[in-house]
């Protein structure tokens, strides 16, 4: 690529709408690295002859980060949606053999090509909304071959689409049918066979567990965390979504990157998160879709200064959501978060939830030029509009990878 000065733009370099530069420019060298940014009037003379790209007054933010997804799976769970509308709870469906286990059956039956094609279709709407980094979990295979298949597909998505993919091994997502009544034996399999094999193949960036009364106990979760720690892998946790099981405090003891969901999180757990530097990842899509009523403790998270991220939690059972912008709106309308909070929740705090705050979530000299250009009058519109296409252009590594076609 040619060294380029992107200009005629309004810059929000750190995802905070109160920290902006009008009539700004970004200079990107031939490696796709930002070498200068600031007011156009202060552009150094050394960049005067570089190629120019006019963004026509668009707002520019860091590329968005979707830090919690289950994008790779087989089938749908539309039938369970009808059950929930009839009053059957998520927990009841799971106990009847539906829920996660029904997706496990469909995922095991699908080959890699089928899973890739289906996941690619789910990924593309996110890319068109300015997402340049995404986390993708396994957890719908629940045996070594199927978990490997899922993680391989996630890696392939990162190789074939203009997005950085971070993989999370979620083998401890649910108890597979063949281990019914033998949860400890399944955790043996996760810790002693699945995780070592997948880590040795370079398929795992982090490790997650579903710690809940319909998932895995604190003791079982800790065993997985110990196995991950021995491998030098960071951990994260699905915690306190349906009850307060104390998982967040355990996650904090292992300095987890994030604890996610958190509707039933208490102040002691929040204090532990703050001390450990663990990010709170809130998932309003799941809250909305399964009609939860227990709100995450936003005020307590604010009080203790715990960074809050937002994510789609895209999955077939509780959040079939393919819009990070709608997630922003939900964060504001359902959780009463502010516009600065939700914007930072999908930029720098989301990057921190992946342990990648040094690479994503901000536009600074020395970083890769990953950014999105928005056709809005104010950044509040990113959380305001519902369903309107707002992203005009996405740049990754200094190269345009998406441009909205008008007319």
From Swiss-Prot:
Residues where Fe(3+) binds: 68, 70, 238, 313
Reaction(s) catalysed (UniProt annotation): 4-imidazolone-5-propanoate + H2O = N-formimidoyl-L-glutamate
EC number(s) per entry: 3.5.2.7
Cofactor note: Binds 1 zinc or iron ion per subunit.
UniProt enzyme class: hydrolase
Task performed by this protein: Catalyzes the hydrolytic cleavage of the carbon-nitrogen bond in imidazolone-5-propanoate to yield N-formimidoyl-L-glutamate. It is the third step in the universal histidine degradation pathway.
Compartments, as annotated in UniProt: Cytoplasm
Listed CDD domains: Imidazolone-5PH
Keywords linked to the UniProt accession: Cytoplasm, Histidine metabolism, Hydrolase, Iron, Metal-binding, Zinc
A Pfam cross-reference name: Amidohydro_1
HAMAP family: HutI
Pathway in which this enzyme or protein is active: Amino-acid degradation; L-histidine degradation into L-glutamate; N-formimidoyl-L-glutamate from L-histidine: step 3/3
GO molecular function: imidazolonepropionase activity; iron ion binding; zinc ion binding
Residues annotated to bind 4-imidazolone-5-propanoate: 77, 140, 173, 241, 318
The organism's taxonomic lineage, starting at the top: Bacteria, Pseudomonadati, Pseudomonadota, Betaproteobacteria, Burkholderiales
Cystine pairings recorded for this chain: none
InterPro entries from the UniProt entry: Amidohydro-rel, HutI, Metal-dep_hydrolase_composite, Metal_Hydrolase
Gene Ontology CC entries for this record: cytoplasm
NCBIfam families in the cross-refs: hutI
Gene name in the database record: hutI
UniProt-recorded name of the protein: Imidazolonepropionase
Keyword Cell wall biogenesis/degradation: no
Cofactor(s) essential for the protein: Zn(2+); Fe(3+)
Binding sites annotated in the UniProt record for N-formimidoyl-L-glutamate: 140, 315, 317
Sequence positions that bind Zn(2+): 68, 70, 238, 313
Top-level taxon in the UniProt lineage: Bacteria
Any one GO BP annotation for this protein: L-histidine catabolic process to glutamate and formamide
Family: Belongs to the metallo-dependent hydrolases superfamily. HutI family.
